[in-house]
Regions:
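Short, small-residue-biased leader/transition segments that mark boundaries at the very start
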Residues: 2-7
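Catalytic phosphate/metal-binding cores of nucleic-acid and nucleotide-processing enzymes, i.e., regions
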Residues: 150
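Catalytic core of the metallo-beta-lactamase
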Residues: 8-62
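Cap/insert and terminal regions of metallo-dependent hydrolase folds
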Residues: 50-141
Length: 151
């Protein structure tokens, strides 16, 4: 590829909400992929985006599972509070998706799902039903076409 290809893409950082220093998400635009949202390590998505074609978004925990894990002694209360202040719950993820125009979205990829506090299958199925979009759960080796058109 030539040097001119560099100008065919844009990467725009945006602030997220996490307990780390200067957390960021990214809106990436490329002529082949269109608009791609990447948002993880945030308990809330403070921005909405136009022209999305593909989304990678954290869907870390289910509040009921998290609470049950505290009640049953699997995790301490302090960890529950940290999770709530630094990660996107299933319901907040769903709200963030619904706040955006999903008309042109081809893929939603759920990332950073907690093994102990989440339910990947329920998250995938619930978000697919609510959005009418193709939803994937990120896992090693997963390959997805991120073209801006589905074919």
């Amino acid at each position: 590829r030539g040097l001119g290809d560099v100008y065919k893409r844009q990467i725009i950082p945006f602030p997220t909400k996490h307990d780390s220093r200067e957390p960021l998400g990214f809106y990436v635009w490329h002529e082949e992929t269109g608009g791609v949202l990447f948002a993880t390590d945030t308990f809330y998505l403070p921005c909405t985006f136009a022209g999305l074609n593909n989304i990678l978004i954290e869907c870390n925990y289910d509040p009921d599972i998290l609470e049950r894990n505290v009640t049953e002694g699997y995790i301490p209360e302090v960890l529950k509070e940290r999770v709530r202040r630094s990660h996107l719950s299933y319901y907040t993820c769903l709200d963030a998706l619904k706040a955006n125009d999903l008309t042109r979205v081809n893929n939603i990829v759920l990332i950073h799902i907690s093994e102990g506090n989440g339910d990947a299958v329920a998250f995938r199925d619930g978000i697919a039903k609510a959005t009418g979009k193709t939803v994937h759960v990120a896992k090693p080796g997963l390959r997805i076409s991120f073209n801006k058109t589905p074919f």
